Amino acid sequence: MYTRPLARLIEELQRLPGIGSKTAQRLALHLLNRPAGEVEALAKALLEAKQTVKHCSICFNWSAEDPCEICRSPQRDPSTWCVVADVKDLIAMERTREFKGLYHVLGGLISPMNGIGAEQLRIRELVARVAREKPQELIFALSPSVEGEVTMHVVKDYLKPVAPGLRMTRLAFGLPMGSELEYADEVTLARALEARQEF
Protein backbone atom coordinates (compact mmCIF):
# COMPACT_ATOMS: atom_id res chain seq x y z
CA MET A 1 0.00 0.00 0.00
CA TYR A 2 2.81 2.47 0.92
CA THR A 3 6.15 2.92 -0.74
CA ARG A 4 8.85 1.34 1.47
CA PRO A 5 10.34 4.60 2.93
CA LEU A 6 6.86 5.85 3.87
CA ALA A 7 5.90 2.50 5.39
CA ARG A 8 9.10 2.55 7.44
CA LEU A 9 8.41 6.10 8.67
CA ILE A 10 4.88 5.11 9.73
CA GLU A 11 6.25 2.01 11.45
CA GLU A 12 8.82 4.07 13.40
CA LEU A 13 6.26 6.70 14.41
CA GLN A 14 3.96 3.97 15.74
CA ARG A 15 6.64 3.01 18.26
CA LEU A 16 6.04 6.29 20.09
CA PRO A 17 3.70 6.11 23.10
CA GLY A 18 0.12 7.04 22.31
CA ILE A 19 0.66 6.91 18.54
CA GLY A 20 -1.52 4.36 16.76
CA SER A 21 -1.46 3.44 13.09
CA LYS A 22 -3.88 6.21 12.00
CA THR A 23 -1.99 8.93 13.88
CA ALA A 24 1.36 7.61 12.61
CA GLN A 25 0.03 7.72 9.05
CA ARG A 26 -1.29 11.27 9.53
CA LEU A 27 2.05 12.44 11.00
CA ALA A 28 4.07 10.77 8.24
CA LEU A 29 1.96 12.33 5.50
CA HIS A 30 2.16 15.72 7.25
CA LEU A 31 5.97 15.47 7.38
CA LEU A 32 6.13 14.63 3.67
CA ASN A 33 4.09 17.75 2.90
CA ARG A 34 6.40 20.04 4.92
CA PRO A 35 9.42 21.83 3.39
CA ALA A 36 12.66 19.83 3.53
CA GLY A 37 14.21 22.41 5.90
CA GLU A 38 11.50 21.86 8.52
CA VAL A 39 11.87 18.08 8.36
CA GLU A 40 15.67 18.38 8.61
CA ALA A 41 15.31 20.70 11.63
CA LEU A 42 13.08 18.11 13.33
CA ALA A 43 15.55 15.31 12.54
CA LYS A 44 18.45 17.42 13.88
CA ALA A 45 16.53 18.29 17.06
CA LEU A 46 15.78 14.59 17.67
CA LEU A 47 19.43 13.59 17.17
CA GLU A 48 20.76 16.49 19.26
CA ALA A 49 18.41 15.70 22.14
CA LYS A 50 19.30 12.00 22.03
CA GLN A 51 23.05 12.76 21.97
CA THR A 52 23.19 15.55 24.55
CA VAL A 53 20.36 15.03 27.04
CA LYS A 54 21.31 12.60 29.83
CA HIS A 55 20.10 11.79 33.33
CA CYS A 56 21.28 14.16 36.06
CA SER A 57 23.70 12.19 38.26
CA ILE A 58 21.98 13.53 41.40
CA CYS A 59 18.20 13.46 40.84
CA PHE A 60 17.90 11.60 37.49
CA ASN A 61 16.02 14.40 35.75
CA TRP A 62 16.78 14.71 32.02
CA SER A 63 19.31 17.47 31.40
CA ALA A 64 21.92 18.65 28.91
CA GLU A 65 24.09 19.62 31.90
CA ASP A 66 25.15 17.61 34.94
CA PRO A 67 23.97 18.34 37.56
CA CYS A 68 20.66 19.59 36.17
CA GLU A 69 19.42 23.16 36.53
CA ILE A 70 17.17 22.28 39.48
CA CYS A 71 19.95 20.56 41.46
CA ARG A 72 22.34 23.47 40.75
CA SER A 73 19.90 26.25 41.65
CA PRO A 74 20.66 28.15 44.88
CA GLN A 75 16.98 29.22 44.91
CA ARG A 76 15.81 25.64 45.61
CA ASP A 77 15.21 24.42 49.17
CA PRO A 78 17.59 21.47 49.78
CA SER A 79 15.72 20.41 52.93
CA THR A 80 12.59 19.26 51.05
CA TRP A 81 12.60 16.72 48.24
CA CYS A 82 9.83 15.47 46.02
CA VAL A 83 10.04 11.79 45.02
CA VAL A 84 8.45 11.11 41.63
CA ALA A 85 8.18 8.02 39.46
CA ASP A 86 9.16 9.64 36.18
CA VAL A 87 10.47 12.88 34.70
CA LYS A 88 7.00 13.64 33.28
CA ASP A 89 5.77 13.74 36.91
CA LEU A 90 8.60 16.14 37.82
CA ILE A 91 7.47 18.36 34.94
CA ALA A 92 3.87 18.20 36.19
CA MET A 93 5.01 19.28 39.67
CA GLU A 94 7.13 22.11 38.24
CA ARG A 95 4.11 23.41 36.31
CA THR A 96 2.37 24.10 39.64
CA ARG A 97 5.12 26.62 40.54
CA GLU A 98 4.43 25.67 44.17
CA PHE A 99 7.23 23.23 44.93
CA LYS A 100 10.57 24.92 45.62
CA GLY A 101 12.66 21.94 46.76
CA LEU A 102 14.68 19.26 44.99
CA TYR A 103 13.60 16.04 43.28
CA HIS A 104 14.45 12.37 43.03
CA VAL A 105 13.19 10.43 40.00
CA LEU A 106 12.73 6.73 40.79
CA GLY A 107 12.42 5.63 37.18
CA GLY A 108 9.05 3.92 37.58
CA LEU A 109 6.86 2.20 40.14
CA ILE A 110 7.11 -1.27 41.66
CA SER A 111 4.90 -3.54 39.58
CA PRO A 112 5.42 -7.29 40.07
CA MET A 113 2.90 -7.97 37.28
CA ASN A 114 5.24 -6.17 34.88
CA GLY A 115 8.42 -7.63 36.38
CA ILE A 116 9.47 -4.37 38.05
CA GLY A 117 10.80 -4.76 41.57
CA ALA A 118 12.59 -2.39 43.95
CA GLU A 119 15.96 -3.33 42.43
CA GLN A 120 14.91 -1.97 39.01
CA LEU A 121 14.19 1.47 40.49
CA ARG A 122 16.58 4.12 41.82
CA ILE A 123 15.77 3.38 45.45
CA ARG A 124 19.36 2.56 46.45
CA GLU A 125 20.46 5.89 44.97
CA LEU A 126 17.74 7.68 46.96
CA VAL A 127 18.78 5.97 50.20
CA ALA A 128 22.46 6.88 49.64
CA ARG A 129 21.53 10.46 48.78
CA VAL A 130 19.29 10.84 51.85
CA ALA A 131 22.07 9.46 54.08
CA ARG A 132 24.58 11.88 52.52
CA GLU A 133 22.50 15.07 52.19
CA LYS A 134 20.06 14.64 55.12
CA PRO A 135 16.87 16.37 53.91
CA GLN A 136 14.17 17.14 56.47
CA GLU A 137 11.18 16.03 54.38
CA LEU A 138 10.42 13.74 51.45
CA ILE A 139 7.16 14.38 49.64
CA PHE A 140 5.98 11.34 47.69
CA ALA A 141 4.28 12.57 44.52
CA LEU A 142 3.43 9.15 43.11
CA SER A 143 0.31 8.28 41.16
CA PRO A 144 -2.52 7.19 43.48
CA SER A 145 -2.54 3.56 42.35
CA VAL A 146 -1.73 0.19 43.90
CA GLU A 147 1.76 0.42 42.37
CA GLY A 148 2.22 3.93 43.78
CA GLU A 149 1.17 2.79 47.27
CA VAL A 150 3.46 -0.25 47.21
CA THR A 151 6.39 1.82 45.96
CA MET A 152 5.85 4.45 48.67
CA HIS A 153 5.84 1.88 51.47
CA VAL A 154 8.85 -0.02 50.13
CA VAL A 155 10.87 3.21 49.84
CA LYS A 156 9.79 4.17 53.37
CA ASP A 157 11.03 0.80 54.69
CA TYR A 158 14.39 1.27 52.93
CA LEU A 159 14.77 4.78 54.40
CA LYS A 160 13.82 4.08 58.04
CA PRO A 161 17.24 2.69 59.08
CA VAL A 162 19.28 5.53 57.52
CA ALA A 163 16.95 8.44 58.34
CA PRO A 164 14.74 7.60 61.34
CA GLY A 165 13.66 11.23 61.91
CA LEU A 166 12.93 12.00 58.26
CA ARG A 167 9.44 13.41 57.70
CA MET A 168 7.73 11.52 54.88
CA THR A 169 4.54 12.92 53.39
CA ARG A 170 2.36 12.17 50.40
CA LEU A 171 0.23 14.36 48.22
CA ALA A 172 -3.30 14.80 49.55
CA PHE A 173 -6.00 12.96 47.70
CA GLY A 174 -7.63 15.34 45.31
CA LEU A 175 -6.22 12.95 42.78
CA PRO A 176 -8.53 10.07 41.91
CA MET A 177 -7.28 6.57 42.72
CA GLY A 178 -5.83 4.87 39.66
CA SER A 179 -5.12 8.13 37.83
CA GLU A 180 -1.79 9.22 36.37
CA LEU A 181 -0.07 12.20 37.99
CA GLU A 182 1.08 13.66 34.66
CA TYR A 183 -2.57 14.18 33.57
CA ALA A 184 -3.60 16.13 36.68
CA ASP A 185 -4.14 19.85 36.18
CA GLU A 186 -1.89 22.39 37.90
CA VAL A 187 -4.53 23.58 40.39
CA THR A 188 -5.34 20.03 41.59
CA LEU A 189 -1.63 19.24 41.94
CA ALA A 190 -0.92 22.50 43.77
CA ARG A 191 -3.77 21.83 46.25
CA ALA A 192 -2.63 18.23 46.74
CA LEU A 193 0.90 19.50 47.45
CA GLU A 194 -0.41 22.06 49.96
CA ALA A 195 -2.54 19.47 51.79
CA ARG A 196 0.06 16.68 51.81
CA GLN A 197 -0.18 14.17 54.65
CA GLU A 198 2.11 12.04 56.77
CA PHE A 199 1.83 8.35 56.01
Swiss-Prot record:
This is Recombination protein RecR. May play a role in DNA repair. It seems to be involved in an RecBC-independent recombinational process of DNA repair. It may act with RecF and RecO. Residues 79-174 form the Toprim domain. One of its GO terms (biological process) is DNA recombination. Pfam families: RecR_C (PF21175), RecR_HhH (PF21176), RecR_ZnF (PF02132), Toprim_4 (PF13662). A zinc finger (C4-type) spans 56-71. It comes from the Bacteria. Belongs to the RecR family. Keywords: DNA damage, DNA recombination, DNA repair, Metal-binding, Zinc, Zinc-finger. SUPFAM superfamilies: Recombination protein RecR (SSF111304). GO terms for molecular function: DNA binding; zinc ion binding. PROSITE patterns: RECR, TOPRIM. Transmembrane segments: none annotated.
